């Protein structure tokens, strides 16, 4: 969970973007990074493998205020979407404060979405987390594609608990910051509860 840096008076929170391969996790993070003021963000780190990559960076949003005199710094991570990188996904989930599940809206990716969501549940449970109890939002990405299923179908397949959900077209930024703000607010609410 979050850790406190007393010398800089910052609470550090980890948000992980999770989802199947090529659903837009990396595109989300790159868009956020490119639109975040240079003085509020760290370096964008990319760990590449032959077929996938993990991105992460941290930033200090100025608009979210303070909690008990501490600023909140968010560390954003993507997980590799390919199934054979499951050990990496588990490692990246360690210490998570909030999750964005990025779903690919294309009809042919619905099964991959459902498998990835179940994989998220399992990997969180193995580390003592419950997806029902941590800050969590869903992003339905690639809404602009002609083969995108309806939001109702996405909801029926992926959002049984009626958690916050957002439509997105990550390359153009549609829905990207709405999704991030939603999960950040949920994380801050948990922090204020002392959770």
Swiss-Prot record:
Cited Pfam families: Arf
GO cellular component: cytoplasm
The keyword RNA-binding appears for this protein: no
GO MF terms, alphabetically ordered: GTP binding; GTPase activity
Any Gene Ontology biological process: regulation of protein localization
Residues the record lists as binding GTP: 19-26, 78-82, 141-144
Keywords for the protein's UniProt record, in alphabetical order: Coiled coil, Cytoplasm, GTP-binding, Nucleotide-binding
Coiled coil region boundaries: 99-128
InterPro entries given in the database record: Gliding_Motility_GTPase, P-loop_NTPase, Small_GTPase_ARF/SAR
Subcellular location per the Swiss-Prot or TrEMBL entry: Cytoplasm
Keyword Ribonucleoprotein: no
Stated role: Required for multicellular development and for both mechanisms of gliding: social (S) and adventurous (A) motility. Acts as an intracellular switch to coordinate A and S motilities. Controls the direction of gliding and gliding speed.
Subunit field text: Interacts with MasK and AglZ.
Recorded family membership: Belongs to the small GTPase superfamily. Arf family. MglA subfamily.
Name of the protein this chain belongs to: Mutual gliding-motility protein MglA
């Amino acid at each position: 969970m979050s850790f406190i840096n007393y010398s800089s008076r910052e609470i550090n929170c980890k948000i992980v973007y999770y989802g199947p391969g090529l659903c837009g996790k990396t595109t989300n993070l790159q868009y956020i990074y490119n639109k975040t003021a240079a003085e509020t963000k760290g370096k964008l780190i990319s760990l590449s493998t032959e077929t996938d990559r993990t991105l992460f960076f941290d930033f200090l949003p100025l608009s979210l205020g303070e909690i008990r005199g501490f600023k909140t710094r968010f560390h954003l991570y993507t997980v590799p979407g390919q199934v054979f990188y499951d050990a990496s996904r588990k490692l990246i989930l360690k210490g998570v404060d909030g999750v964005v599940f990025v779903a690919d809206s294309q009809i042919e990716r619905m099964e991959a979405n459902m498998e990835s969501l179940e994989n998220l549940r399992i990997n969180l449970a193995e580390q003592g987390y419950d997806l029902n109890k941590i800050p969590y939002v869903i992003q339905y990405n690639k809404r602009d594609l002609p083969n995108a299923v309806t939001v109702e179908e996405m909801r029926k397949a992926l959002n049984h608990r009626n958690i916050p959900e957002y439509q997105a077209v990550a390359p153009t930024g549609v829905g990207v910051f709405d999704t991030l703000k939603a999960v950040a607010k949920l994380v801050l609410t948990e922090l204020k509860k002392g959770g």
